[in-house]
Amino acid sequence: MDLFWDTSAVVPLIFDEQHTLGALQAYQKGEGFFAWDWLTIETEAALSRRKARSFQWEKWSEISKLFQWVHLPQNEWADIRKQNRNWMLRAADAAHLYAFRRVCSILPDLRLVTFDDEQISLASKKGFRLF
C-alpha cells in the first residue's frame, strides 16, 4: 500500500505517544512511503524540542531513508495559498495536503496517514483516501 505521511504520523513512530499504535500499523502495511520534504524539518524540530536521545535520532534516520520526497517548488506556492483560502488549514498542513493531492494524480490509490484532526476532517470531506 502506498502511503503519504504527515508529520503527525511520523513522530509517533519515534516517540511512544497516543498515536503510536496507529502509526505502527500504517508503517507495517506501507510499501511505498511518500512525504513532502518539509517533513524532515518538522520531524527534526520535534526531536530537538523533545530532547530526543541518540537512539531516537537513529530511528528517525532509518525511517527517513524509506521516503520518496515530494518537493513543492516556489512556482506552486501561489496555488497552495489559493487552495488554502478554502481549506483554512495551518500553512504546513495545507502544503502537506497539497503535496498529497499532487501525488494522488500519479498514484490514485495513495492513502494519507495523519493524526491531525483538521487534516482528517478536510480530507474526509474532500474524499481523499485516509489510512
What are the roles of these predicted feature ranges?
Residues 1, 30-33, 66-68, 106-111:
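Short active-site oxyanion
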Residues 1-35, 49-58, 128:
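Short, well-structured N-terminal submotif of metal-dependent ribonuclease cores
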Residues 8-9, 38, 117-118:
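Alpha-helix/helix-capping structural signal
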Residues 37-85:
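Active-site-proximal, substrate-binding regions of enzyme catalytic domains
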Residues 69-118, 128:
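Active-site neighborhoods of divalent-metal-dependent phosphate/nucleic-acid chemistry enzymes
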